[in-house]
Amino acid sequence: MIMSKKEKIFRTTKEVLKTAKRRKTSSTRWLQRQINDPYVRQAQAEGKRSRAAYKIIQIDEKYKIFNLGDSVLDLGAAPGSWTEVALERAGGFTLAIDILDMDSIKKAVILKADLQEEESVDLIKKLSVDKFDVVLSDMAASTTGHKSTDHIRTQALAELAALYAVDFLKNGGTFCAKVFQGGTHGDLLLELKKNFKTIKHYKPDASRKGSPETYVIAKGFKE
């Protein structure tokens, strides 16, 4: 049986995430970092769900990814900080999807589903009456400490998110997703160049200095 490109991406993503090594973390180091992080303190003071809210705020301030009334699909949305920002800055129909439980967000539709399963595509279609102006993805697999492994895993999730973007964006729409430093490359970069007019990479100030994450912003989707 010959698999389609879409089927290969779904299968590859699951295999990459399943076989990667588990990371050994230091809870003490993590707690100390949280205490000293100004964006953590700001998020707590302003009632944000997480410091990640400031990443998408800064991305939007630089690249204007939201327009008033835009509909937004937020992939891997938990705990919901990007969803809240999307509602504040766009305010259109907003669908947040994650395999994890999420507390409700006023005016957002929340779907608990595994994006690695093709059934999620059908669920999104049932919940949305039209395609989306913006597709977001802050998805990242837990890191292992092994740079090449972490890059491969994050690249796999970015490819998965791009697949959803191509399926669900309106003509002229915008895709914003987390990638690792070095940006997009290989098949993912070719896919984005084929489907979008402009592609930029940006590391917002809210991204921790020691983090390898950066973001790809692809605008002008060609339906």
Q: Where do the language-model regions lie?
A:
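Class I SAM-dependent methyltransferase Rossmann-like catalytic core
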Residues: 2-68
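Conserved class I S-adenosyl-L-methionine
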Residues: 68-78
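Glycine-centered, small-residue-biased loops immediately flanking beta-strands
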Residues: 70, 92, 173
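Conserved SAM-binding loop of SAM-dependent methyltransferases across substrates and taxa
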Residues: 79-90
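S-adenosyl-L-methionine
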Residues: 97-144
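A short glycine-rich, Lys/Arg-flanked "PGG" loop and its adjoining helix->strand segment in the class I
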Residues: 155-171
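Conserved beta-strand signature within the Rossmann-like core of class I S-adenosyl-L-methionine
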Residues: 172-179
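Class I S-adenosyl-L-methionine
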Residues: 181-223
